[in-house]
């Protein structure tokens, strides 16, 4: 019933609908044992984002030509804390993907036991093949539209695919200029302006810690094992460093 309603409301959003379906199937037995959950419409409230911002990002490339992209911020759930989730810059970005990521980010952040909600944002802008100046102008234009919806007690973005320390720095710089505040509104910043010492390695290290815990539940020691890693981006290099 819940999935049928979602499919009717959000046709074509395959990534988002698949993520919701997988979660619902995993909690079905427990949910059915608690009729009070259904009475309070817990699932219906959990699977829909609190709000979504969609906006045009207009910027000028190195040839002096005006370019336009779409920007998004999905503030999915802040039941236990401010919205928290990365910003992704990639040509494949669309609302369905960001809703799926924001939905799963809610659970991911809850598992940390820290007071963080779930959110996700991004744009169909691709940094690949762009100059530093073009990326800076895009990040500033992106933040010009989004800044009023962010804050340390409201929504705290981070990096993601296509968004590293450089891009976070450009966006945070614009945010500071617009708000006239130096607050903890972004994570993933450079060390020079408030970043964490081990942030670059954190995701890759965490992946290895997770794999090690999985193996330990089966009585297997990770020492001496061969680790296969695909790619060599923000996550892979940290995982490779920890694996060696």
Task: Show which residues each predicted segment covers.
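Structured beta-strand/loop patches that form or line metal/cofactor-binding pockets in enzymes
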Residues: 36-65
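Glycine-rich Rossmann-fold phosphate-binding loop(s) that bind the pyrophosphate
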Residues: 232
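Hydrophobic Val/Ile/Leu positions in short beta-strands of Rossmann-like dinucleotide-binding domains
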Residues: 227-229
């Amino acid at each position: 019933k819940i999935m049928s309603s979602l499919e009717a409301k959000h046709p074509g959003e395959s990534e988002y609908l698949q993520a919701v379906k997988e979660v619902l199937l995993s909690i079905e037995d427990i949910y059915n044992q608690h009729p009070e959950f259904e009475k309070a419409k817990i699932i219906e409230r959990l699977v829909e984002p609190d709000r979504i911002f969609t906006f045009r990002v207009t910027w000028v490339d190195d040839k002096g030509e005006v370019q336009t992209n779409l920007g998004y911020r999905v503030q999915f759930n802040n039941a236990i804390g401010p919205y928290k989730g990365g910003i992704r810059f990639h040509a494949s970005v669309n609302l369905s993907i960001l809703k799926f990521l924001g939905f799963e980010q809610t659970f991911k952040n809850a598992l940390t036991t820290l007071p963080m909600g779930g959110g996700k944002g991004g744009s169909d802008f691709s940094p690949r093949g762009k100059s530093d100046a073009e990326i800076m102008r895009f990040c500033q234009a992106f933040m010009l539209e989004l800044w009023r919806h962010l804050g340390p007690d409201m929504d705290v973005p981070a990096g993601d695919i296509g968004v590293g320390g450089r891009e976070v720095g450009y966006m945070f710089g614009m945010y500071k200029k617009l708000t006239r505040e130096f607050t903890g509104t972004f994570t993933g910043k450079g060390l020079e302006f408030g970043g964490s010492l081990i942030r670059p390695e954190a995701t890759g290290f965490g992946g290895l810690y997770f794999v090690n815990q999985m193996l330990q539940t089966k009585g297997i020691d990770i020492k001496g094992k061969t680790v296969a890693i695909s790619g060599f981006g923000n996550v892979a290099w940290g995982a490779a460093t920890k694996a060696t």
